[in-house]
Amino acid sequence: MVTKAKTARTPTVGFVSLGCPKATVDSERILTQLRAEGYGIVGSYDDADVVVVNTCGFIDAAVQESLEAIGEAIAENGKVIVTGCLGAKGELIREVHPKVLAVSGPHALDEVMEAVHGALPKPHDPFADLIPPGGIKLTPRHYAYLKISEGCNHRCSFCIIPSMRGDLVSRPIGEVMHEAEALVSAGVQELLVVSQDTSAYGVDVKYRPGFWGGRPVKTRMTELARALGSLGAWVRLHYVYPYPSVDDVIPLMADGVILPYLDIPFQHASPRILKLMKRPGAVEKTLDRIHAWRAAVPELTLRSTFIVGFPGETDPEFEELLDFLKHAQLDRVGCFKYSPIEGAVANELPDPVPEELKDERLERFMETQAEISAARLDAKIGRTIEVLVDEEDEVGTLARSHADAPEIDGVVYLEGVFGLKPGTRLTVKVDEADAHDLWATPV
């Protein structure tokens, strides 16, 4: 139990962060503000005067995980503030957990702080030097997510993000660059650019110029990527919608300004299914563009995600998807079974695919891609590549190459290599590979 003396000395907040990297950035902003106001951040329910839970509500499994996390926090602590995507469904949260102190939606910093102030009065004398230059981060010190916008203008039939996070709102480019500079100054070696639709950055403000370094810079993905690349850190683009404008960043990759890595969620390859999803459907043009990108940047890594078992997906259409994988030769791929999400338009589509068939298709999809990924990694044996050290374990050092985003891609194992600090960059020679990872030796 928290004593009055402890509360008077340093009010403490526990934090649970769930969901995607965009939610992680929201959590980091809340944590930074809490520290700026003098609150202590603790890692256990017992030590916390109040607990903030930043939720995810994108799919049913995420909703359930969030509700369970809220329930655990209530059981272990009792004073719980809920925010995040599931917070947009406040009635559901209060129905399941009526004891929560407050509920707010995503990117609701002011509302969260108001709720914290109501439950736990603001400390009298916070110190500015409690805040690291790059703010409070939930990631290791050597990499950080950089969120450049909120919301999305697309209305994909399987997605409810716009109803939770609203339409696209781009952050001012000067603000983004100042944050990036602070992160790099604090030791960050890799900036992972995230948003719901990175390639649409600036569309909402008609690409109007902002200011950074005393000069005007357009609020647009290409100009942002070029400016970020000038800071000296790795720059990795995530969640890039397959617009023609993607072609404009390929020269920056060829010139080494940003990493030769694109995370583009293609979702499917059947034109009919893509139309039902309300996604771009020119598959042949997509393959042509992939080949053109690789011709310009041979070391380009392509990551994508797909959905199998979408309502109405036939056997021939699933075979189209497998054929696309074989022609596209993507490096990293994630795949999900279609799951009905409350509020999604796709729920109303006819001919749902049976769960057993979804499972079978998912297995075949992953088997097909595993062979492709293994072959592409096997082709790297004997090459020298640059890696970034993440951590050390009892076997050696774990690092990542340009082709590996943290947590979702593979790693490069440096067995028997010790003493390298996280964030160190070095050149290694690839000795072995499997379908996911590489083994290498420092050069």
UniProtKB/Swiss-Prot annotation:
GO MF entry, a single one: 4 iron, 4 sulfur cluster binding
E.C. designation(s): 2.8.4.4
UniProt cross-references to PROSITE patterns, sorted A to Z: MTTASE_N (PS51449), MTTASE_RADICAL (PS01278), RADICAL_SAM (PS51918), TRAM (PS50926)
Gene that produces this protein: rimO
Entry-linked CDD domains: Radical_SAM
Pfam families xref list: Radical_SAM, TRAM_2, UPF0004
HAMAP family for this protein: MTTase_RimO (MF_01865)
Protein name: Ribosomal protein uS12 methylthiotransferase RimO
Keywords: 4Fe-4S, Cytoplasm, Iron, Iron-sulfur, Metal-binding, S-adenosyl-L-methionine, Transferase
